[in-house]
Amino acid sequence: MNSDGRHHQSSSGAPRGPANPGQRGQVPPDDRLTAILPPVTDDRSAPHADSIEAVKAALDGAPPMPPPRDPLEEVTAALAAPPGKPPRGDQLGGRRRPPGPPGPPGSSGQPAGRLPQPRVDLPRVGQINWKWIRRSLYLTAAVVILLPMVTFTMAYLIVDVPKPGDIRTNQVSTILASDGSEIAKIVPPEGNRVDVNLSQVPMHVRQAVIAAEDRNFYSNPGFSFTGFARAVKNNLFGGDLQGGSTITQQYVKNALVGSAQHGWSGLMRKAKELVIATKMSGEWSKDDVLQAYLNIIYFGRGAYGISAASKAYFDKPVEQLTVAEGALLAALIRRPSTLDPAVDPEGAHARWNWVLDGMVETKALSPNDRAAQVFPETVPPDLARAENQTKGPNGLIERQVTRELLELFNIDEQTLNTQGLVVTTTIDPQAQRAAEKAVAKYLDGQDPDMRAAVVSIDPHNGAVRAYYGGDNANGFDFAQAGLQTGSSFKVFALVAALEQGIGLGYQVDSSPLTVDGIKITNVEGEGCGTCNIAEALKMSLNTSYYRLMLKLNGGPQAVADAAHQAGIASSFPGVAHTLSEDGKGGPPNNGIVLGQYQTRVIDMASAYATLAASGIYHPPHFVQKVVSANGQVLFDASTADNTGDQRIPKAVADNVTAAMEPIAGYSRGHNLAGGRDSAAKTGTTQFGDTTANKDAWMVGYTPSLSTAVWVGTVKGDEPLVTASGAAIYGSGLPSDIWKATMDGALKGTSNETFPKPTEVGGYAGVPPPPPPPEVPPSETVIQPTVEIAPGITIPIGPPTTITLAPPPPAPPAATPTPPP
């Protein structure tokens, strides 16, 4: 204890005295991190006015206070201070010095002899620091006023506003047939959109949108200050986030910023929207903004942009919209789904009237014209939605076109969904209709599980002219399925034989044979004895072609190689290696000649097209031309090199064609109409170990069209029979569909002939049948006789010998059963 009777802290030596009532005590140092405790004394006075102040001081960790002054000095300083101002001695950096211990009665500065008066705590009043209050107010004003201005200016200078046309919205790509008719639309996930130029939008439609959304559009700076302030309030305290945005702000929100949200993130989005809209107004013309806005805004029914909305609500081009129709579309922008006339006719009518009144207010419509307007009729929503959905076989064409664009033409999905592509395909509407009608006709009344696939390809360039994989736009595509081909694969054994110098006149036995314990027979015991390989192909003799395959160098692998050369894919989805016994690229087994391995319908059409083109292979393709929304040609097949690849020697291909020419007529009279030349081959596969069938084929071509037809069942797990229960062979329903498709597709075109084959293996084409054996003339001896009694004759005179002409040829034998 010192001379003044005050204790000192042992750890710091800072003075510590009793608390003066009404005064804030000295803040002790923060000793929470030390184990040294101050000494305990009898002095119970606290250094702070109350326990709360003590805790706050301890947490603040304030430095120790300097020693207090003498009480006499305190009084003297208080008396000398100006009125209303605390003595300077009580101000240390904005803090009062701590008072000393209370003095004796009368030592507080009161005149002697007076009774003690209630003490006024002048030092506490002196704690209010007006200088710091003023500084705080200035800082607050700077934050509230100057900071947003500086931030806005910096953001304005930094933000980069794209040029008109740089912002690519997701647009609908259109798929067209070769004649320009529409096949399908590739609709982006968020809906239907087709961009148009502002010049295509009638003036009254533009004025209706302005009247509905931003009546000062052409005069405002791109933003509404009152609307922005209202949006800020609603972001912070809840409420409608629309905020009375201008057309420019709405466009920025939809194209660049995104939809607003409540809270701080929503406020930041709104601020960004304001900056970009302001700068855009200085760099874009108002017409550019309006055009971009009309192409991006949502109108309901899955329609984005004024062009798609015109189709969705009125089924007409935007150029044909009337004043009343344009006003209704403008009325929908605020609440497109709920204001649809099909949902809320009264609300739609009220908003429509409001838009028309706005057009009068903005001088876009005269009062008389306004009075003449009638609320327009709209198409049903279901019809509008159906317009955006591809139906029937076209959906499978769309699928193939999309795949081809993505895989083959370096047109990625983003480009496909944003550039509003116009894709012209190779599909010939006449051929497509013929294929669809043929399938519908011949499958009508059959088993509901029966399915068919048809693909027609132009041999000159590989263009797919008709494509039918099923009638469900979103269903399974049987034209892309792996299916067993049966005897239609024998053609590739013939290709391999001719490539090895075995001509069409080569004779082969047709009797049954057994190889490795497997007995090979012909359907219904057919045979030709021994005949040439062209005749064996016409009759589809399994035994003859099995023997031919065994004779080939390479055997079954030679058949596989010939098939791949012609155009049979080496792999496709679901089959990593085609024509391979182990499925890993290993060699095939002998059953390849009978069509045991899986092949797609489109590949059979393509491979036969190679034969039709005298051995020149053209990859099958759907895409003829691709043009972007702004008219840029991205791809044009007519300018590409399409000379093809001579995969098979011309002489070989032409001899194969010659061997196949009689088959269509031989297969139950399926010659093409008008005597048109064709080359074809049927095929049938067996259903397991039964005598029933599972798949049936007819594949054939003319010089200008190759068509493959498959008929089977959904899962291939049941016998393929007609409605009457009869087994279906390739010469039956598939040949019917093939003939109808070819006749319909080629109707109106000139008949063509195949090239005359040159010699291969000593034969140029199919050798003529051997002449019948010569029959020597017969002689007849006539002996004159005379009857001498009833029933009794005797010769008279010498006999006479007469030479007779050869007998006339025997009538033709019965026609053999056509090949399956």
UniProtKB/Swiss-Prot annotation:
Q: Does the keyword Cytoplasm apply?
A: no
- Origin species: Mycobacterium tuberculosis (strain ATCC 25618 / H37Rv)
Q: What Gene Ontology molecular-function terms does this entry list?
A: penicillin binding; peptidoglycan glycosyltransferase activity; serine-type D-Ala-D-Ala carboxypeptidase activity
Q: Compositional bias of type Pro residues: which residue ranges?
A: 805-820
> Keyword annotations for this protein?
Carboxypeptidase, Cell membrane, Cell shape, Cell wall biogenesis/degradation, Glycosyltransferase, Hydrolase, Membrane, Multifunctional enzyme, Peptidoglycan synthesis, Protease, Transferase, Transmembrane, Transmembrane helix
Pathway entry = Cell wall biogenesis; peptidoglycan biosynthesis
Region annotation Disordered: where it falls in the sequence: 1-120, 792-820
One GO term under biological process is:
regulation of cell shape
Q: Where is the composition biased (Low complexity)?
A: 792-804
| Annotated region described as Transpeptidase, given as residue ranges | 453-743
Reaction it catalyzes: [GlcNAc-(1->4)-Mur2Ac(oyl-L-Ala-gamma-D-Glu-L-Lys-D-Ala-D-Ala)](n)-di-trans,octa-cis-undecaprenyl diphosphate + beta-D-GlcNAc-(1->4)-Mur2Ac(oyl-L-Ala-gamma-D-Glu-L-Lys-D-Ala-D-Ala)-di-trans,octa-cis-undecaprenyl diphosphate = [GlcNAc-(1->4)-Mur2Ac(oyl-L-Ala-gamma-D-Glu-L-Lys-D-Ala-D-Ala)](n+1)-di-trans,octa-cis-undecaprenyl diphosphate + di-trans,octa-cis-undecaprenyl diphosphate + H(+); Preferential cleavage: (Ac)2-L-Lys-D-Ala-|-D-Ala. Also transpeptidation of peptidyl-alanyl moieties that are N-acyl substituents of D-alanine
Q: What is its EC number?
A: 2.4.99.28, 3.4.16.4
The primary site where this protein sits is membrane
Q: What is this protein called?
A: Penicillin-binding protein 1A
Provide the transmembrane region boundaries. 139-159
Q: How is this protein annotated for GO cellular component?
A: outer membrane-bounded periplasmic space; plasma membrane
Which intervals of the chain are annotated as region Transglycosylase?
A: 180-360
Catalytic residues in the record: E213 (proton donor), S487 (acyl-ester intermediate)
Family (UniProt): In the N-terminal section; belongs to the glycosyltransferase 51 family.
Q: Where in the cell is it found?
A: Cell membrane
Subunit field text:
Interacts with RipA via its transpeptidase domain (residues 561-820).
What function is annotated for this protein? Cell wall formation. Synthesis of cross-linked peptidoglycan from the lipid intermediates. The enzyme has a penicillin-insensitive transglycosylase N-terminal domain (formation of linear glycan strands) and a penicillin-sensitive transpeptidase C-terminal domain (cross-linking of the peptide subunits). Has little peptidoglycan hydrolytic activity; however it inhibits the synergistic peptidoglycan hydrolysis of RipA plus RpfB.
Q: What is known of its domains?
A: A penicillin-binding domain is found between residues 420-820.
Biased-composition ranges, Basic and acidic residues, are 41-53
InterPro entries named in the record: Beta-lactam/transpept-like, Glyco_trans_51, Glycosyltr_51/Transpeptidase, Lysozyme-like_dom_sf, PBP_transglycosylase, PCN-bd_Tpept
Q: Give the way it sits in the membrane.
A: Single-pass membrane protein
